[in-house]
Amino acid sequence: MTQTLNRQIVLANRPKGSPVPENFRLEQTAIPTPSEGEVLLRSVYLSLDPYMRGRMNEGKSYADPVELNDVMVGGTVCQVVESKNSDFQTGEWVVAYTGWQDYALSDGEGLFKLGNEPTHPSYALGVLGMPGFTAYVGLLEIGQPQAGDTLVVAAATGAVGSMVGQIGKLKGCHVIGVAGGAEKCQYAKETLGFDECLDHTADDFAEQLAATCDKGIDVYFENVGGKVFDAVLPLLNVGARVPLCGLISQYNATALPEGPDRMSMLMGNILVKRIKMQGFIIFDHYEQSYTNFVKDVSQWLAEGKIHYREHLVEGLENAPEAFIGLLQGKNFGKLVIQTNQPV
């Protein structure tokens, strides 16, 4: 083992609004030594996801916040570099939750084996990981799409949205994506197979959406919030379903958005149109749905029915800048940090 220190990125202070590089700090500590029953893991890939922004706040949401000076949380794909646990062998690849650091100890609980030579190990953080599972559960169990439905997907080229749209097409939906910029919209249509994709930065976005969804919207997969939802709301059909996955446009907000209070309009639409709007946290669904997810998506990948794009950034030290860019929509595909080269 040539590396002698463990790099860690910790939460230096809590952001006020949008995160800045100064909210993070790179530290170096001794590489831990496994005790009996433990394994030493070395991360190779780190997943960066929007939910991490909420964990930087002081208040608890659905999970405890990251404490100041603690390692930032995150899913990882690691290799076992030393094992004192008979269930794991040196060199094995595992999915773990070791966060923004090079090395971590584990007693084996919660580790998911990928074998010795997985073809695409980083896929376990994306299309076959939490983002893919989020899309699968949110659309199929909450959105309940039917053939012929109009499905609108916010953040259509992101890790979750790109999967939602493609699964929707497999289920016979007419799929409309919403993304930022012409390049992403072109990718959604030409590569992912969306029927249409609209640029939410266009001045006439709301008018374009209304013209495109001339028969209304049956399922809206919400990843963004803000003005995109404002444009979607009046177009929702009677009995529409809205899986509420995320609100990335609001994660950095420090106050209520400007403008009139639209809560009564929202509640009125939900009442009159009998709209089903349901938030969900993916960790609640692993026991009942994960096996089917892996089986279905693995088959779709093998058959070429699902396309997947990674935005790979080299170097753990670049994680803060990449994460800040993620919240600004600068990534194109699933954002993954390659922290180290495989052993």
Give the location of each predicted region.
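Short amphipathic alpha-helix with an adjacent loop that forms part of the alpha/beta core around
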Residues: 204-214
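Short, glycine/polar-rich helix-capping loops at beta-to-alpha or helix-loop-helix junctions
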Residues: 101-102, 180-190, 262-267
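C-terminal capping/lid region of NAD(P)-dependent oxidoreductase domains
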Residues: 3-6, 303-312, 320-343
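Glycine-rich phosphate-binding loop and adjacent beta-alpha segment
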Residues: 227-306, 339-343
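Mid-domain Rossmann-like dinucleotide-binding core that forms the NAD(H)/NADP(H) cofactor-binding site
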Residues: 125-203
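NAD(P)H dinucleotide-binding glycine-rich loop of Rossmann-like/cofactor-binding domains
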Residues: 72-79, 86-155
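Short glycine-centered segments of the SAM/dcSAM-binding site in methyltransferase folds
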Residues: 93, 150, 174, 240-241, ...
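Glycine-rich beta-strand-centered segment in the early N-terminal region that forms part
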Residues: 30-48, 56-100
